[in-house]
């Protein structure tokens, strides 16, 4: 093998961070040597394909990375190749070499056709005997890595791969770290929040014992199908793990040795946490059976993937949502700046490139995103969560939930357009959206649509008050209703109950002042590409304040053009007539919550429907009517359609 010169690879401003001379890259054409077959997943930095080595006929896994698109991840790619090339263990995925063709880097690895341990949990509950075998093999992999003074730092079921014959191997070394004689403990902030050790979250020095904590969380994940706190926002979990007692494995179906094993792994004091070698001697592990008992489980998972279309993956796959996956959150990996160690080139200082986005995924919102610790923004958010009170975790609730605080506060100051000390956000519908029956009704109520400056916009005051009191709103419902049917900025509910600001191309406003404010805000929040539906800001970066929705509600209830009532009047609860929300939507969501579709996103959807109905009474009825019209017409007669709508929107007598 020969090494390529640095000129053949993408250059960064800081050339010291690009020490590719320590990584062997072959100059041969990989498309000649390998036959690329179907895509089998998406890893840390690129797509993974099944392939054939034409020289030997061996089946391999091919990870293909576009280095031009993955510029921010080059050091992590470098780290993964470095660690893989140094490992030689039957419990760690094997690395066969790397090839560069143009800007595409081909990483050739061992193919494991059974998918991940996470895939095994998706096809059904795991028995304790299966879990014991998987944990034993992970422990053997960790024992090897720790003996080589390497920390994996991202142990979880998705990063444990299995072969079709029951072999279990540790994979995905994108955030692995090296312990040297001079650097015996790490101080960086990386890993997946749900599996992260308390000492790592607190940014204390840590060592290989952090992997043991992650193993304990993985044990609970294998038993329950999800890690502890999976119904909470990842940023809130970062606050809870150091503060709360360690999770415990609950359920009478689990044996006492299994529960004791988990308890030993989840000791909050790393000094009292056992090593991998010690845990291999534990009763629960010693009585584990042979790997062959996993074969039936692997075949069951393969049948499930064929039936549902869910692809296996070393991380969450973009396509898995469409195949019936039920993950409650995108379980992201936090990748942080590395502290440079000796001159062995393994651990390097990350460049100080600003990281404005919390989520690196494409605008389509594929899972498997990455929270970046490249700037102090995440640290500030985490510190705010530690200092703030923990409220309700429900989306859109009146209380100050930690996740809501994070979603609001994570929008950088530079991304907020201001005019006279206030921020203007204009609401509307996306381009080309059909005019609903609700919009037609509202446009009839307010035909003029002419209002003066402050009544045409939604102003968010920015001051030194708490976040929950920092918003005051002035809304012209007539302008809002007129603007809903124009091609402008819209608020939509995304998948998983998220709300997104979608930047439209048209102005949809009368008056230069409002147009200017709308343009300033659109430019401020546009972080992914130009206008249109492509320039979107995720719910986790911003959300619509509840107080603004309340003022919008009062604007509709108390007459168009009339000033909203005082805050004292806002506190008076308005009686709500039962309709489609209570008769159809909430019961349907409640039914789904008792099935395999029960997710945090479903709970958020329930809150969203309630918030929308509170803001605009009767809108759920309109929604049901609109849906029924689109589904039934012209196949169903109008009388039958009216009867069906009445059943869905009227309480039973």
Curated annotation (Swiss-Prot):
InterPro entries: Kinase-like_dom_sf, PDC10_dimerisation_sf, PDCD10_N, Prot_kinase_dom, Protein_kinase_ATP_BS, STE20/SPS1-PAK. Residues 345-362, 459-468 have a biased composition (Basic and acidic residues). It is a peripheral membrane protein. The keyword Membrane applies. Its EC number is 2.7.11.1. It is found in: Cytoplasm; Apical cell membrane. SMART domains: S_TKc. PROSITE patterns: PROTEIN_KINASE_ATP, PROTEIN_KINASE_DOM. Keywords: ATP-binding, Cell membrane, Cytoplasm, Differentiation, Kinase, Magnesium, Meiosis, Membrane, Metal-binding, Nucleotide-binding, Oogenesis, Serine/threonine-protein kinase, Transferase. Residues 309-373, 389-563 are annotated as: Disordered. Changing residue 63 to R: Probable loss of activity. Truncated excretory canals. One of its GO terms (biological process) is oogenesis. Changing residue 188 to A: Probable loss of activity. Truncated excretory canals. Disruption phenotype: RNAi-mediated knockdown causes sterility resulting from several defects in oogenesis. Proximal ends of the gonads are filled with small germ cells and have a decrease in the number of nuclei in all stages of oogenesis especially at the pachytene stage where there is 60 percent less nuclei. In addition, animals lack a discernible rachis which is a tube-like formation of anucleate cytoplasm between pachytene nuclei, no clear transition into progression from pachytene to diplotene stage and a failure to progress from diplotene into diakinesis. Increased germline cell apoptosis. It catalyses: L-seryl-[protein] + ATP = O-phospho-L-seryl-[protein] + ADP + H(+); L-threonyl-[protein] + ATP = O-phospho-L-threonyl-[protein] + ADP + H(+). The active site is at residue 154. Interacts (via N-terminus) with mpk-1 (isoform a). Interacts with ccm-3. Belongs to the protein kinase superfamily. STE Ser/Thr protein kinase family. STE20 subfamily. This is Germinal center kinase 1.
């Amino acid at each position: 093998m020969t090494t390529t010169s640095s000129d053949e690879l993408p250059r960064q401003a800081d050339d010291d961070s690009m020490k590719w001379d320590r990584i062997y890259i072959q100059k041969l054409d990989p498309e000649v040597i390998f036959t690329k077959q179907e895509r089998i997943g998406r890893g840390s930095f690129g797509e993974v394909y099944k392939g054939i080595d034409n020289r030997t006929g061996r089946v391999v896994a091919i990870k293909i990375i576009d280095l031009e698109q993955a510029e921010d991840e080059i050091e992590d790619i470098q780290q993964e190749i470095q660690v893989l090339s140094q490992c030689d263990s039957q419990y760690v995925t094997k690395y066969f070499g790397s090839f560069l063709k143009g800007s595409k880097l081909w990483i050739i690895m061992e193919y494991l056709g059974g998918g991940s341990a996470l895939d095994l949990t998706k096809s059904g509950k795991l028995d304790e005997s299966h879990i014991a075998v998987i944990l034993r093999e992970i422990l053997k992999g960790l024992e090897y890595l720790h003996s080589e003074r390497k920390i994996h730092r991202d142990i979880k079921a998705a990063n444990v791969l299995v072969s079709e014959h029951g072999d279990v191997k540790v994979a995905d070394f994108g955030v692995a770290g090296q312990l040297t004689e001079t650097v015996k403990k790490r101080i960086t902030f990386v890993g997946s929040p749900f599996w992260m050790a308390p000492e790592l979250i607190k940014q204390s020095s840590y060592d290989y014992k952090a992997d043991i904590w992650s193993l304990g969380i993985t044990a609970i994940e294998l038993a329950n199908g999800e890690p502890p706190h999976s119904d909470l926002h990842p940023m809130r979990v970062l606050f809870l793990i150091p503060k709360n007692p360690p999770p415990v494995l609950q359920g009478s179906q689990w044996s006492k040795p299994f529960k004791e094993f988990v308890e030993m792994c989840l000791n909050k004091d790393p000094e009292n946490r056992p090593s991998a070698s010690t845990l291999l001697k534990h009763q629960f592990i010693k009585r584990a059976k042979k790997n062959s008992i996993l074969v039936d489980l692997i075949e069951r998972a393969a049948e499930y993937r064929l039936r549902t279309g869910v692809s296996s993956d070393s991380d969450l796959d973009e396509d898995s949502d469409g195949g019936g996956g039920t993950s409650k959150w995108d379980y992201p990996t936090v990748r942080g700046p590395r502290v440079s160690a000796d001159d062995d080139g393994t651990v390097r200082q990350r460049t100080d490139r600003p990281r404005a986005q919390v989520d690196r995924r494409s605008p389509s919102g594929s899972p498997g995103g990455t929270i970046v610790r490249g700037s102090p923004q995440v640290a500030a958010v985490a510190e705010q969560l530690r200092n703030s009170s923990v409220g309700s975790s429900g989306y859109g609730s009146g209380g100050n939930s930690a996740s809501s605080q994070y979603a609001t506060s994570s929008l950088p100051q530079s991304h907020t357009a201001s005019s006279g000390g206030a921020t203007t956000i204009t609401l509307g519908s996306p381009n080309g959206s059909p005019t609903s029956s609700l919009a037609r009704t509202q446009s009839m109520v307010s035909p003029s649509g002419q209002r003066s400056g402050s009544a045409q916009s939604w102003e968010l005051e920015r001051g030194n008050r708490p976040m929950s009191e920092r918003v005051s709103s002035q809304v012209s419902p007539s302008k809002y209703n007129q603007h809903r049917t124009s091609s402008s900025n819209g608020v939509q509910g995304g998948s998983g109950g998220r709300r997104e600001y979608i930047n439209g191309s048209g102005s949809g406003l009368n008056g230069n002042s409002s147009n200017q404010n709308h343009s300033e805000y659109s430019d401020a929040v546009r972080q992914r590409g130009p206008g249109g539906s492509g320039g979107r800001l995720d719910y986790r970066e911003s959300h619509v304040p509840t107080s603004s929705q309340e003022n919008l509600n009062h604007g509709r209830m108390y007459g168009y053009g009339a000033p909203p009532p005082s805050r004292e009047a806002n506190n008076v609860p308005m009686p709500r007539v039962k309709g489609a929300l209570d008769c159809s939507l909430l019961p349907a969501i409640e039914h789904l919550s008792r099935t395999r579709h029960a997710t945090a996103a479903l709970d958020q959807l329930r809150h969203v429907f309630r918030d929308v109905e509170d803001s605009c009474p009767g809108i759920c009825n309109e929604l049901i009517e609109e849906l029924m019209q689109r589904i039934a017409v012209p196949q169903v007669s109008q009388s039958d359609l009216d009867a069906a709508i009445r059943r869905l929107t009227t309480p039973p007598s």
